[in-house]
Amino acid sequence: MRIHEVTPKEGSTKRRRRVGRGISAGQGASCGFGMRGQKSRSGTGTKAGFEGGQMPLYRRIPKLKHFPLVNPKHYTIINVGKLESLEPNTEVTLESLMEQGIITTNDGPLKVLGDGTLTKALTVKAAAFSKSAQEKIAATGGSWEVLSRKSQQDTEKDE
């Protein structure tokens, strides 16, 4: 077998369409473009979404607000009232709360909210705090520290 004897498998190739070669060829005269008009001329034709001058669909539909975020931030949420069960002067992190069973599911970095009362001084380390949570932790003599989201995600990957 030589290179000039190699042919494609039967039925794998289609004959190309020869347009403008007479009426008997099937694509003669107007070459399959119909009679006149913008779609028969050379060039790009109409833009996508053009409806012939009718008000297009994307302009008929109202502009809706409050679409959901594509990549929303998901936090593991806890209120300061739940931290009341911990011993005074302990360091509170997502890992320590998981170990003690106060938080059962890890939905992402820890966020502390201000619902409930807190009477013990604690050192709380979390990715985010609400204003009321910061005030309640500081009022008891405790401290709070904002961890970066990356540092918390790195510890989650290690586990």
Curated annotation (Swiss-Prot):
Sequence ranges of Basic and acidic residues compositional bias: 1-13
Superkingdom of the source species: Bacteria
Matches recorded under Gene3D superfamilies: 3.100.10.10
A Gene Ontology cellular-component term: cytosolic large ribosomal subunit
SUPFAM superfamilies, per database record: Ribosomal proteins L15p and L18e
UniProt region (Disordered), positions on chain: 1-51
Function recorded in the entry: Binds to the 23S rRNA.
Assembly behavior: Part of the 50S ribosomal subunit.
UniProt cross-references to PANTHER family, sorted A to Z: 50S RIBOSOMAL PROTEIN L15 (PTHR12934), LARGE RIBOSOMAL SUBUNIT PROTEIN UL15M (PTHR12934:SF11)
Family: Belongs to the universal ribosomal protein uL15 family.
NCBIfam families xrefs: rplO_bact
Annotated protein name in UniProt: Large ribosomal subunit protein uL15
Organism whose genome encodes this protein: Rippkaea orientalis (strain PCC 8801 / RF-1) (Cyanothece sp. (strain PCC 8801))
Classification lineage: Bacteria, Bacillati, Cyanobacteriota, Cyanophyceae, Oscillatoriophycideae
